């Protein structure tokens, strides 16, 4: 009996592109008729098939595993710092897990806060701050079909590949996968090149069509009772456009891979030497004409899905053997750093200097250097970083990590005060404000009065997002001004916003001013804060909002 390539793919749990490559290599029995492969079903290897029965059991939704995985990835690397790094919910997770479990059935979403993340000197991208309950539900729902997606993904795709040890995280290390992507394509261009096209997609996560995405999930045989709440969550977060998925969560990375599967399979099926890491794509050929043909074909395929290639980021060129790349300099500096060699400081400083030469900084290089120079407590670049804070806004978390080592020094405090007071329109980005406030909370002794006044103004502006007001409230509390403390108490007791109440409870605890009647009143109105109250009662000190474990932060600097 003969069957089609899609049917063989379903039976073997592999992608259609993989089936075609196995047919071409003689590893699966079949023949090509009229330019299309047919598969000899009776000669297929006996591998477990993917169940297509209408009555198949619903995949198990594991919200507890989702929280464990999120603590290792998403929650540790949020766009802006949380006042407790969500440790209160991790310590007493029962209520938040129950709420997340309910969302996995209803799809009812909480309000999403958009953080404008600087991208270049003038533009931004929309980072999504989901509630913890929403984030857990989103992750748990998507995790139910992660294995199906993994089986269908081509081995030419390196982004967001499933981790064999699910307790350690949903995906393999993004850093390791990015390095493999670079190493593999660099080897490939030396043997199958020398021409390579490099391109990426414009605002990829923000342009994903929900309609097309759910068509792909249907083809992947995701059950309707998983798709329905997932669809409702995405609608709730993006109700205005029905396009876009949250930037940041691992769940979105999984959906991002699924959305590109059809493009991957078509490019590979047509014989193009194609490689992908999420929205970064490379095509290799032995002539300029051939690589441009492939690029044009990719452009057409992406356009049919509502995606656009970035013209400024599309590069076509010859890559001769032995040519050094930016990644080579990063790898060498990282080798010096990890092995404690004297050359480390000089090499990493050089990377930082080169990242700041142009008006638009090399963000990845700046982030790489700042984290490592912070680990080395390298004072030599301090003055340069303070002078360039306005240009380092894209690397705000890493800048804060570096500055925290010197945050109690009077000279540095004066420089930060001047910077906060200095910019005219449009002023300091909220994203950078949040990370600077987190660094200011690391100060030993009393913060400068100017910082308290600055933070107080932020708390009093109801138009500011709650995450920013909460961070500012914690700095205000350290000033122990009676008027400010009275406002914190009143907010904790009377405010209707549980996020703001949580922030003020933490602020009062930070100042040693949290009293039981205030806690009782807050929890009676916002029962979900019971875990916060228990956490604060059991702690003699609060966690650093920057120091996630310096070595792990060094390990996790993103390559995208």
Model-derived features with residue positions:
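Polyanion-binding surface elements
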Residues: 1-16
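Short helix-start
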Residues: 4-6, 27-51
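DNA major-groove recognition helix of helix-turn-helix
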Residues: 23
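Conserved two-metal-ion catalytic palm core of "right-hand" nucleic acid polymerases
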Residues: 52-224, 235-249
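Conserved polymerase palm-domain catalytic core
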Residues: 172-278, 282-301, 305-308, 313-317, ...
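Short, low-order "capping/linker" segments at domain edges
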Residues: 323-337
């Amino acid at each position: 009996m003969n069957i089609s390539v899609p049917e063989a793919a379903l039976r073997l749990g592999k992608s259609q592109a993989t089936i075609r490559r196995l047919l071409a290599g003689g590893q699966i029995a079949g023949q090509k008729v009229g330019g299309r492969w047919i598969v000899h079903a009776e000669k297929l290897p006996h591998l477990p098939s993917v169940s297509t029965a209408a009555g198949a059991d619903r995949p198990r939704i594991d919200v507890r595993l989702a929280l464990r995985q999120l603590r290792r990835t998403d929650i540790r690397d949020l766009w802006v710092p949380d006042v407790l790094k969500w440790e209160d919910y991790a310590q007493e997770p029962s209520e938040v897990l129950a709420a997340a479990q309910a969302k996995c059935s209803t799809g009812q979403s909480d309000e999403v806060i958009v953080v404008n993340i600087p991208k270049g000197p003038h533009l931004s991208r929309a980072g999504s701050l989901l509630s913890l309950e929403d984030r857990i539900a989103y992750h748990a729902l998507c995790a139910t079909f992660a294995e199906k997606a993994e089986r269908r993904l081509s081995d030419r795709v390196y982004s967001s590949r499933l981790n064999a040890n699910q307790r350690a995280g949903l995906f393999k290390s993004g850093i390791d996968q990015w390095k493999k992507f670079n190493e593999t394509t660099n080897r490939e261009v030396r043997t199958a090149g020398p021409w390579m096209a490099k391109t990426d997609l414009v605002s990829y996560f923000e342009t994903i069509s929900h309609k097309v995405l759910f068509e792909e999930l249907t083809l992947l045989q995701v059950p309707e009772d998983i798709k329905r709440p997932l669809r409702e969550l995405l609608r709730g977060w993006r109700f205005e456009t029905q396009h876009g998925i949250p930037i940041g969560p691992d769940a979105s990375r999984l959906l991002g891979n699924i959305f590109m599967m059809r493009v991957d399979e078509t490019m590979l099926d047509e014989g193009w030497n194609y490689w992908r890491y999420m929205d970064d794509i490379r095509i290799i050929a032995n002539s300029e004409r051939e690589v441009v043909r492939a690029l044009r074909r990719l452009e057409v395929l992406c356009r049919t899905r509502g995606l656009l290639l970035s013209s400024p980021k599309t590069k076509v060129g010859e890559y001769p053997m032995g040519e050094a790349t930016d990644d080579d300099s990063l790898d060498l500096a990282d080798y010096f750093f990890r092995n404690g060699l004297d050359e480390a400081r000089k090499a990493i400083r050089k990377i930082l200097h080169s990242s700041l030469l142009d008006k638009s900084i090399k963000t990845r290089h700046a982030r790489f250097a700042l984290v490592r120079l912070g680990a080395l407590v390298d004072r030599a670049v301090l003055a340069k970083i303070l002078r360039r804070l306005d240009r380092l806004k894209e690397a705000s978390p890493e800048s804060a990590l570096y500055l925290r080592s010197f945050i109690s020094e009077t000279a540095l405090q004066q420089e930060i005060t001047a910077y906060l007071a200095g910019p005219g329109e449009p002023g300091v980005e909220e994203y950078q404000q949040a990370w600077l406030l987190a660094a200011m909370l690391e100060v030993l002794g009393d913060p400068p009065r100017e910082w308290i006044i600055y933070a107080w103004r932020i708390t009093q502006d109801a138009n500011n997002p709650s995450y920013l007001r909460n961070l500012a409230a914690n700095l205000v509390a350290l000033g122990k001004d009676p008027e400010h403390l009275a406002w914190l108490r009143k907010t904790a007791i009377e405010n209707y916003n549980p996020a703001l109440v949580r922030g003020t409870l933490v602020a009062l605890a930070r100042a040693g001013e949290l009293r039981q009647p205030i806690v009782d009143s807050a929890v009676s109105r916002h029962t979900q804060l019971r875990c916060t109250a228990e956490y604060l009662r059991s702690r003699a000190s609060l966690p650093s909002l920057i120091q996630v474990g310096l070595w792990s932060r060094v390990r996790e600097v993103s390559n995208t």
